[in-house]
Amino acid sequence: MQELIERDGPACVWCGREPWVRDCTLEHVIPRSRGGHATPENALMACRACNRRRGSRPVDAYVRELEAAGGTPDVGKLRQTLAGLTGSERRRHRDEAARQLRRLTAPARPDR
């Protein structure tokens, strides 16, 4: 976890809060349930509360949910991580990252 904090900083990617070390968790950008692995390229720092709330939802869905509630997730860091994953040696990382990156950069659909 310390290497992750040194690489990305101590702030949660979802809420921006700097949690106590015991509340820091490794956030799988591509969740394990969607083929993600516990590799440095697929990991960002998140507080325990945000990691639990997100569960295994896709990045774009959780970003939109947070923004609708007034949150400010670090979309730049998420895009950068997803872009890096599109070049992964792991096919499932590449495919899911490309799909999530497209959805994250697409304009939000107006409510119907």
Identify the role of each PLM range:
Residues 1-11, 77-91, 100-101:
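Short, charged surface segments at domain edges that flank catalytic/cofactor-binding sites
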Residues 1-24, 47:
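Short cysteine-rich loop/turn motifs with clustered Cys
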Residues 1-3, 31-37:
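Short, intrinsically disordered, charge-biased short linear motifs at domain edges
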Residues 25-29:
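Histidine-centered catalytic micro-motifs used for acid/base chemistry in nuclease
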Residues 35-53:
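Short beta-strand-alpha-helix junction that forms the catalytic/metal-binding core
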